[in-house]
């Protein structure tokens, strides 16, 4: 039987684009690990994606994962939009490059060993783990130390509709 793991995530950006950070909590039974990092120039969506990626990449075994996020962009992207993006060679319905493709591809790879359920939680509504992740993300955004190389590349391309 696979380990049952809960992951909670959030991203933050002080300005969009601007300094940003992510926060994640990984919980297995009574054990918890937190993750956070800050980037000098990024977007809120990139930080939401990074939170999920980092937590999933920390898992060393195939697990049953319930991942809770307040980002509809992440939840819908990974459960709905990604299928057509891949069929179209990572292009939107308008034949534009998918924004944040580097992170979508990384997230897609990170979920492969696992069975996932994606839960949406309303942000800033008192959900304890979401509030903790928000605090981790905001603190990291206030002390950015990393360069978001993918954002710099992404900034040179135009977006389009998400699907």
Curated annotation (Swiss-Prot):
Enzymatic class: hydrolase
Catalytic activity: Endonucleolytic cleavage to 5'-phosphomonoester
Entry binding sites for Mg(2+) 2: 10, 134
Domain RNase H type-1 stretches: 1-142
Domain of life: Bacteria
Pfam families reported for this sequence: RNase_H
Localization (cell): Cytoplasm
UniProt KW keywords: Cytoplasm, Endonuclease, Hydrolase, Magnesium, Metal-binding, Nuclease
CDD domains linked: RNase_HI_prokaryote_like (cd09278)
Cofactor info, note text: Binds 1 Mg(2+) ion per subunit. May bind a second metal ion at a regulatory site, or after substrate binding.
Cofactor(s) listed: Mg(2+)
Annotated GO biological process: DNA replication, removal of RNA primer
Sequence positions that bind Mg(2+) 1: 10, 48, 70
Main location, first listed in the record: cytoplasm
GO molecular function: magnesium ion binding; nucleic acid binding; RNA-DNA hybrid ribonuclease activity
GO cellular component, one term: cytoplasm
Entry EC no(s): 3.1.26.4
HAMAP family linked: RNase_H
Subunit (UniProt): Monomer.
Similarity comment: Belongs to the RNase H family.
Function according to Swiss-Prot or TrEMBL: Endonuclease that specifically degrades the RNA of RNA-DNA hybrids.
Database matches in NCBIfam families: PRK00203.1 (NF001236)
Protein name (database record): Ribonuclease H
Species in which this protein is naturally found: Sodalis glossinidius (strain morsitans)
